[in-house]
């Protein structure tokens, strides 16, 4: 009899545990690679405070993530390192910004979450003694340095292209001359600099901080525009309320403190209405 009671008790406990696991909400977050460190820390805090929710984070270049969403990947929240990628999924944007008239953003959910800076960084020993973007320009013109930057579909690469154009530099000619190497996301560019395989690279100031790199110079808005990170709930989300709750949490004090510790700035005061 005692054995029977024990077996029944075990079965009841297993059933309860199974029910508890079944009730867990899985929230899929697509986020720019530059958010890896901060969002990984935030994920732990959020899951501890909300044990009924499990965050599944997919970090990559914003262009790659946008393509995955467009091709039908499951995504509840998308946080991009640039407006372009979200614009291309947002039906409320005009035809110039969303020429394919894609409609993946849940109406009313889009916000401007964070601001970052574009930074010039070098390996620890700064082999070329580069001191600024101005000096880098002259060195590139003379073919004296090797610079790493993001691919054309990567926001940090798009910002870097604008900086090159600001200085009147021809990216294609520099690449053909072997003076530019590329990374598929900002982490790859950062790694090239950390490993000393290039003389310098253009990354976000937050990635420089996370990698322990010194920022040599910071691009102004006149050089490449402001670096705004938009975020939105996706229209095909099966858990839109949970997705919105997480987005609201990201704007809160606890999450924003983590973002700001590595150099992000809150955009809450300028939030898109």
Describe the function of each predicted region.
Residues 2-22:
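Sec-dependent N-terminal signal peptides of Gram-positive bacterial secreted proteins and lipoproteins
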Residues 72-74:
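Charged, often glycine-rich, active-site loop that binds/positions anionic groups
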Residues 16, 23-49, 58, 63, ...:
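Exported/periplasmic ABC-transporter solute-binding proteins
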Residues 104-106:
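Alpha-helical scaffolding within the catalytic cores
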Residues 76-80:
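Periplasmic-binding protein-like
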